[in-house]
Regions:
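N-terminal beta1-alpha1 ligand-phosphate binding loop
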Residues: 2-37
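Glycine-rich phosphate/pyrophosphate-binding loop and the adjoining helix
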Residues: 2-5, 9, 146-190
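Short beta-strand segments enriched in small/hydrophobic residues
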Residues: 7-14, 118-121, 165
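A general structural signal for well-ordered alpha-helical segments in protein cores
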Residues: 8, 21, 25, 66, ...
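N-terminal beta-loop-helix "entrance" segment that forms/cooperates
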Residues: 44-61, 160-164
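Helix-loop-strand module that forms the ligand-binding subsite of alpha/beta enzymes
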Residues: 61-143
């Protein structure tokens, strides 16, 4: 029986220059790759997705960026998502991408089907973006994703990162290692 590494699609709910969530995601990706995972990183902002509008979809179909997102999701076994919190919710960029990806696609299986996911957040606030993660967890679960129970929210993110990209707080660094480790062990590819 052949085995392969788990394939993980990683993306952030922010495309802001200097995004703390992009930094957190990059560090998590390093940890995953060091443990043997194949990780694809996708910049949601680069997909240039229009705001989802059913009439536009009916008239013109899904834009090319939506197809790229769906293909990337289908090519991977698991998702690693880092999202800031906007008004106690995850970002509009992330919500719009999920809305587009979840639309029916010419008889293709849902790109969310059978996926595992791990969630991360970082914020300059004291709560680290944790208030946005429950809504993201519910949405992904409703789409058939098994969202792992462990998660990480990094508070005071403007002070949280060392020069090498790691987290200065050893407890947060340990939790991040546990979250990515759980994602690797949750999916056992054949």
């Amino acid at each position: 029986m052949s085995t392969r590494n788990v394939r993980i699609l990683a993306f952030a709910g922010s495309s802001r220059a200097g995004s703390y969530n992009v930094r957190l995601l990059a560090h998590a990706v390093e940890l995953l790759r060091a443990r043997g995972a194949d990780v694809d990183v996708l910049d949601l902002g680069a997909l240039d997705l229009p705001l989802y509008y059913a009439d536009d979809e009916a008239a013109h179909g899904a834009p090319a960026g939506v197809q790229r997102l769906r293909e990337a999701m289908r090519a991977n076994d698991a998702l690693l998502i880092a999202s800031p919190e906007y008004n106690c919710f995850f970002t509009p960029l992330l919500k719009n991408a999920i809305d587009w990806a979840s639309r029916p696609d010419s008889g293709q299986p849902s790109p969310f089907a059978g996926k595992f996911a791990a969630l991360l957040a970082a914020s300059p606030g004291a709560l680290g973006g944790v208030r946005g993660l429950p809504a993201l967890r519910i949405l992904l679960s409703n789409l058939g994703v098994l969202v792992l129970p462990g998660q990480l929210a990094v508070p005071l993110a403007h002070e949280a990162f060392a020069d090498d990209g790691s987290l200065r707080d050893a407890r947060l660094e340990k939790t991040l290692g546990e979250v990515v480790g759980a994602l690797l062990t949750a999916f056992k590819p054949a």
